Amino acid sequence: LPTQDSSRLVIEQGAQIDVSGLRDVTLSMSRNQMANRVFKSELADQPLQRDGVLYRQTLQFDARNPINVANVKGFYEGIQRDAREWSTVGGNVSIIGSGSVSVQGASINVSGGRITYEDGALKTSLLRKGDRIVTLDQAKSGDRYDELYNSTSGNGKSVAGFEQGFDAGSLTLSAGQALA
């Protein structure tokens, strides 16, 4: 903590400091559609899949669902995000003084924002093992699959829109004497 002196920092009543995340960002559901080819590097940790039906094939999946039969981390990292998306996380405010700090009646907003995803459709690859067919996100890394199916027509599975919330920021108030 700072040593106390006679200085004063006053944020007037009615003042508003707002570093909250954006709440009016809307994206298409297709933003969650992944369609990427997998190679040896994505299958390096999957010995049963390395030379199987997934190798050099395009996998279609919902980015919100984990995939166990390939390492698709790099695909997630490749999603392009604009400034509005990055601005959904709340900001940080630090008010530091060595004397007194007064923020009585002021409003400081560090809340997190949200992204609203519209209704849409997503395609998911299917895998066949014997007479059983599973979606890619249900596939187990310990199973060797006989065939991969990708949708080449149609819209895919309908998915209801949703809201995704983001982290709030922080408020740091440090003073010899604080009135909040």
Feature locations, PLM:
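Extracellular and secretory-pathway beta-repeat/beta-biased strand scaffolds
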Residues: 1-180
